[in-house]
Every structure is written in structure tokens, then in C-alpha cells.
Amino acid sequence: WAQGLKSIINAKAPNTELDWKDRISGEQPTISHEIGQWCVYPDLKERKKYTGVLKAKNFDIFEDRLRENGLLHLADSFLLASGKLQTLCYKADIEAALRTKGFGGFQLLDLHDFPGQGSALVGVLNPFWESKGYVTPQEYSEFCNRVVPLARMPRLVYNSGDTLKVSVEVAQYGAENLTLPVDWKLITSDGRLIKGGRFEQCNLPTGTLSHVGNLEIPLLVDKPQQCSLEVSTGGYRNHWNIWVYPTVKVENGDVMVASEWNEEVRTRLEEGGKVLLTARFGTLKNE
């Protein structure tokens, strides 16, 4: 998170291929320490739970700032939205560790918020080990468990006519080796099955990452669709959302769309035309 917009999650388009194999391939040891620390918005309702000497005075400051900006009525919405994003970020971080063969493990700062040093709202639980209401134990256990199905996809946004290419893996850290079928299915947001199948009797030795097989699924839609790829084995399940859009040719009409200032743009404006200029940072002089 300290990298801000330059971090892997922010700098690259959404995908599920991230791992740390290049990072651990060198001669120096790599330590995974307090990964993530993805913060959420404070739950102002939590203050009434502090009945002892410790008081959540920092939450009073957060409430004052919301009120001053006319946003107090959105406090619960901010908590829910930031919590859903936090869950996706922890899922990305934890799955990256599990996708790294030979990786020794990962460590979070905590599963619950840490109130002992300023505001560290990094947990999926509050300081009282209670749910914040945006993720269930079942949902979190999909990607953080002794057995975790995994799917490597180069991107999560597609056009109709594209092929969804997936490498299916299983991270298995249970007590013993397993030999199990691995099922998969791609469904729409309303539960309609697009395609499904099974990899029969896969060897899943304990303490490692196992490659199960590859998928190639044609994507054909006539309207935007959010779909879910689900992979399951032995009672363990994981899923990832993808988005598929129809290929539509966009007509600009009488509006010129340009990404840089040039003579053609200047001429169009001098003639009274319309221009949508989406200039990249640093391409215009600071005059």
C-alpha cells in the first residue's frame, strides 16, 4: 500500500496471474511480513462497544469531518464500499502467495483492527473480533484455507468473441496428500451456466502448488455480462468475477476525439468544431 498508485494492484489491469516467483528466485532470502494492511472506513457504530478506559476518540474526529462535509449519512456506505475493496485486495495478495511455488507462507498484521497505535483499520474484523458486515467467514475462506483452488487469468475484462484462457491450480496444505476431481463452471450473474467441466482424479500432494489443467472458453454476449468462474474440489471452492462486453463500433459523430494537441485539433477548433481532448499528463506545456 505504501507504493500508492504504483503498486501492482493499482498499476496493472485486473488479473489473477500475480505471484512472487521472480522475487524469490534470487540468492537473498525474501520475508513476507504483514502483507496488505488494506484499510477500511471506520464503523462509527463501534464506539459504543468501548465501555472501559479505552475510548475511540479518533472515531469522533472521523465523524466530525464527515459532518463538516455533509457526508455523515454516507458513513455506512463508505464502510461497505471500502470493505468490499479491502476483501478484493487481500484476496489478490493471499492468492499471489499461494500461486508462488516454494513460498514459505504469508503473514497478515492481524485479522482484526489494531487500536493500540493510532488508527489501523486493517482487519476484516473489528477490535472485538466481530464481523464488520461486508465479508463472511465462508467468503474469506475461499482464498485463505488449507486447500485453495486457484485460476490464473491474464485479465478479467473481455469483449464478445474473445477466448477466456485459464490455468487451473490448487494450493494444498492439508494434513495428507489428496487425489480428487476438480470441477469448474462459468456462470452468469443470474446463475445461468455458460460452460462447465471436470478434471478427473487430480494428484494434489500436500505442502505445494499443483497445476491441474487449462481451460479455453469462448465468450459470446449480446449485452454486457458479469460472469463468475468457480473452481471447486473436495468441498473447497473459490471464484472470480469477469466482465464481458459486446463489441460495438462507436461513432464519434461531429466530435473529434484526440489524445494530444496538434495542428489538426487547432484547425478543427478554429473552424468552430467540437473536440474532446484527453491529453496525457505531461503532454501540455504549463503556460
Task: List each language-model region with its residue ranges.
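Substrate-binding/catalytic cleft of secreted carbohydrate-active enzymes
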Residues: W1-L125
